[in-house]
Amino acid sequence: MNLPLFAALVVILTLIMIKAAEQVAYPLTGYFSSLVSDYLEANQKLAPFYTHAPSIDGVKAAMAARDLFNTPRLALVNALNKQYETVKATDLIIANIQSLKDSNTYTVTTAHQPNLFTGPLYFIYKIAHTIALSRSLNKQMPEAKFVPVYYMGSEDADLDELGFVNIGGQKLVWQTKQTGAVGRMLVDVELLSLIKLIEGQIGVSVHGIAWVNLLKQSFTIGKTIAQATLEIVHHLFGAYGLVVVQPDSPDLKSLFTSVIEKELTTGFSNNAVQQTIKNLSVHYKVQAAGRAINLFYLQGNKRERIVQTDAGYEVTALGLSFTKDQILADVQNNPANYSPNVILRGVFQETILPNIAFIGGGGELAYWLELKQVFADAAVPFPVLLLRNSFLLVPAKRALQLQKMHINTVNLFKGRPQVIIDSFVKANSVHHLQINTQMAAIEAQYTLIKEQAAAIDASLVDHIEALSHKQAQKLLQVQKKMLRAEKRKYEAEQQQITKIMEQLFPGGSLQERTENIADWYKIYGTHFVDAIVENSDDFSKGFTLLYLND
């Protein structure tokens, strides 16, 4: 299918699925830290911690900085061609990979670990954002080319975080005996049993069967999790030209050896990050703390810390020890054995890619803002940092209920259902349910009494203040009882609000942090992915609510 026809079909199908969309400013949702809010509002307190503003001008400045850096483009293309030998790449992906040889081609990147079956919805949203931003930049700057990239954090060893998925409100956990780097783990019978469970949950619909078949095709026995994740992401986003980078590669690690050696011999990254943390922590909570050496050693599936000793270096958990000369020789001979942690992971990414923008969640932005000096000391360009897009998917039935109850968008983010119920009852009751005016009048009377008593005996003041406080508490109890009595008249609406909130904010958390794409793919199929891409901002403007058609 040619690209113009594909694009036209995507737009038509998206219009069928999406009834309407609106946005809420991120700070109003209550789900984002003060650091993220300040970054989005260009607060000057954060200006020292990043290089380029999250804007088109910032992108242009990042492009100029990237042009001065010797990105290993040919080696990158060769490594990607090798990685894609096992996948039937689309013509657009092939063209995008080959274009990376050209000095006027840049990447827009998001990074994430290989969560089981793609994990939470924001995994999908992050990748869709890279596609939307790349598309926008290609339109605005046709003299250059921008390629969307998903950079897979396959060396992460936190199986507790990555080895489960929530589908249909049920948490499915991969009960494997494997340990170490999750991307290097193999699909086993325990994992296949989860696919069987998912089939029982969603296999009754045409799109549900399609999703299960995709899982079965991607996750076959003996295949690495990294390879399976590449295949499923390729199936979802390949038509958009998304390039998946698997950095756990000897070819790509060999491009990073100079930084690895510098870290081993000088510990430069920790020195840089500690001063930044000191400055940043004056105003904000620190997201990531560095170590003396911010590298792990990979052996098989094991990923363990490297520690410097008087005699050289040790990887205690693996029983390994090196002199300085031995470890430097090992870096040259076996670069794939060295795995950067959170402090150096971004430096590796920006070393091998011609990248100009990085898209991440609030937590990711928080630790990237600690890294500006690390990048400077490594002499690697620092990209534009962009907060990923966020979505709340509102089914047609729930949207209609909200409309009938006149509950506005911002109220949805107030948290607990009880807060929204109280607000709804107060807004719809024909009675006055608050006695603030009366309480203020009584407080004024106590103030007069206190002044009168103080003129007679100052020791009476404390007693009168205690009486005033006690009276205020009793009146608040009366107000609560009035509200409870009125709420009993709205039992049906209370039940509706509770069900709405349970669906839109499962477990009291954001939908995108809990649910998996399977819950929506089973209804809309591939149109779901298309709709997310089409409704993704380039430079994130707010938390997007998508009102869905049946």
Q: Where are the predicted features?
A:
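A structural-propensity feature for long, helix-poor, extended segments
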Residues: 159-166, 394-422
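A translation/RNA-centric and nucleic-acid-associated enzymatic feature enriched
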Residues: 287-356, 362-373, 382-384, 391-395, ...
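Glycine-rich phosphate/pyrophosphate-binding loops
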Residues: 120-121, 134-158, 383
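Long, compositionally biased intrinsically disordered regions
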Residues: 18, 232-322, 418-421, 425-550
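A glycine-rich helix N-cap at a beta->alpha junction
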Residues: 166-193
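N-terminal catalytic cores of NTP/NDP-binding nucleotidyl/phosphoryl-transfer enzymes
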Residues: 103-138, 360
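Low-complexity, highly charged intrinsically disordered N-terminal segments
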Residues: 31-91, 475
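Short acidic, glycine/serine/threonine-rich loops at helix termini
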Residues: 121-122, 159-165, 255-260
